[in-house]
Amino acid sequence: MEQLARLYHDHIQVLNQRVSEIISRENLSGLVIHSGQPHRQFLDDMDYPFKVNPHFKAWLPVIENPNSWLVINGSDKPLLIFYRPVDFWHKVADEPSDFWAEHVDIKFLTKADKVAEYLPAGIDNWAYIGEHLDVADVLGFSRRNPDSVLSYLNYHRATKTDYELACMRKANEIAVTGHQAAKTAFYNGASEFEILQVYLSAISQGENQVPYSSIVALNENSAILHYTALEYTSPAQRRSFLIDAGANYNGYASDITRSYSFEKNIFDDLITAMDNMQLQIISMMKPGVSYAELHIQTHYKLAQILLDFDIVSGDVQGLVEQGITRVFFPHGLGHMLGIQVHDMGGFLSDEKGTHVAAPEAHPFLRCTRELDINQVLTIEPGVYIIDSLLAELKQDQRQSQINWNTVDVLRPFGGIRIEDNVIVHGDRIENMTRNLGLNR
């Protein structure tokens, strides 16, 4: 923890430098960042699970305390307005005493609607950063989520500080423990629901604490890209298992996927081939490489795998150009990762917010930036038997290039996705996930 505290000190300095730069450019006095506030369910007296403003948790590992605020001018010690109501119905957050507390001035807010008393004078020259524009209006903010400020912050958020990298390594360590437990549960006959409970228990995090809804899919369900339905009974025949699940540490996310076959068969061989391909793509990563180009190269490598397994016929170039590989791999190669699972800034080419769209043929790619030092990205190629996409091939001449017998053999297994979390360094690539022992 002492090392993390030292890294946090440097982290805050970097964030202050960023704020100092952008408020100087925009002639602002500073930023007021709102953690957020609860959302009430319609016609009910309960709230949805609270999700903190990512710009707030970039500064502090305070992720479950709504109605809190940060006042930052880039030079003075940040002011944390920490919400601690008098409340006998709910758990009230403890007074901050962790390693980060000494780096901020703290004032306690007991009533959410009294925050104006703690905000700086001349509030119209401060920028509000947050979701609740109605609150910003009432408080007198005229600058609310300025595009220039958000673009600057989102662009630079891609470059992680050493503190952030340490947190993400820990988030991977936690998730790997869960993945190993989930794998054992699969081979021991657990249902999707039971596997998820094993995973959450192993990482000691609840469903509302993990960074995204976990995907735990058996058999054909593995072909549903964002499958979160969960079956409560085990299938009569156990064929395959795909788990896409992460963990949270100090507000930072891990995002890991693994695929398994219950028996040694063609599907197991296909997993091995995809695993090797994923590692090949990771080996191509270095500063200056286009992430979009990595995605395109993945399609060429996948085309060869489809040929090797007699899933399709033709040649690599033609399979890619005709869009056949996109039917089997319809999503993007991955995305930036950090305080959000799909971290902001993936489409920005500069700090002014210049947007670089995904290639027209690959609209679901979530990152088009050039790789640079201290960026963290996921690499997650996949191959799936998705009937709705295959049906499109049956409508034109491309159907003759599909070996439908092999497709029928693979259909009950669903699909494969293999995802690691990777740090780009100047002289190497750090695969946090594999370094922790979560291999094939």
From Swiss-Prot:
Disulfide bonds: none annotated. Its EC number is 3.4.13.9. Gene3D superfamilies: Creatinase/methionine aminopeptidase superfamily, Creatinase/prolidase N-terminal domain. Its cofactor is Mn(2+). It catalyses: Xaa-L-Pro dipeptide + H2O = an L-alpha-amino acid + L-proline. Mn(2+) 2 binds at D244, D255, E419. Keywords: Dipeptidase, Hydrolase, Manganese, Metal-binding, Metalloprotease, Protease. Binds 2 manganese ions per subunit. One of its GO terms (molecular function) is aminopeptidase activity. It holds the Pfam family PepQ_N. It comes from the Bacteria. Splits dipeptides with a prolyl residue in the C-terminal position. This is Xaa-Pro dipeptidase. It comes from Shewanella pealeana (strain ATCC 700345 / ANG-SQ1).
